[in-house]
Amino acid sequence: MRNINIAIINYECGNIHSARKAFELALTELDISGSVTVTNDPEIIFKADKLVLPGVGAFSECFNKLKSVKGLSESITERVHDHGVPILGICIGLQLLADKGFENIESKGLGWISGQVENLCPDDKNLKIPHMGWNEVNFKRDDGRFSDLNGEDFYFVHSYYFNAKNTIGTDFRILIWTSSIKLYTERVMEIA
């Protein structure tokens, strides 16, 4: 079995400790040889087999911090787009892949996935924002990757959602599969 090198991208907007611990536990539990490195060094990112982009905070602030580290967003883009390295965006980490976001101010995103991050405004005014609590997740289209998760409960804490352009309706997306995946969940270790 080959060694898997996972790089968790540190741009000062993520719950880095929890992400690192979750991936270290997943490697151990699944008996996979590998390493988990927290980094903002483009050279380490170029050597990684898998990338993780966590994120906590406001969209525009996180985007600006990501862009402020010299060569960071360019190295991530090259690894994902040119070399096909998979990336897992967690919370705002996935949202940053959108064209733009509207948290506090309108802000440009990386533009990797068509769509925008919008305020969660339910039709039912009795529903509270931020959306917090356990909810059942149902997949509209499942190619089998997530069949074990359909109907499972996940914990949500958010006020914004990724409105992908290739979908319609009022449901909000918690997972968009392209070269990335995102789950709003505190159960990352259990799922892994």
Enumerate the language-model features and the residues they cover.
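Glycine-rich nucleotide phosphate-binding loop and flanking beta-alpha elements
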Residues: 15, 58-60, 94-96, 161-163
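Amide-donor transfer/coupling interface in amidating biosynthetic enzymes
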Residues: 45, 81-82, 115-192
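Gly/Ala-rich beta-loop-alpha elbow adjacent to hydrolase catalytic centers
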Residues: 89, 93
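Short glycine-enriched nucleophile-adjacent loop
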Residues: 98-100
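Acidic active-site catalytic centers that drive phospho-/nucleotidyl reactions
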Residues: 10, 95, 158
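Short glycine/proline-enriched turns and hinge-like loops at secondary-structure junctions
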Residues: 102-105, 148-150
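N-terminal beta1-alpha1 cap of cysteine-dependent amidohydrolase-like domains
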Residues: 1-85, 105, 116-118
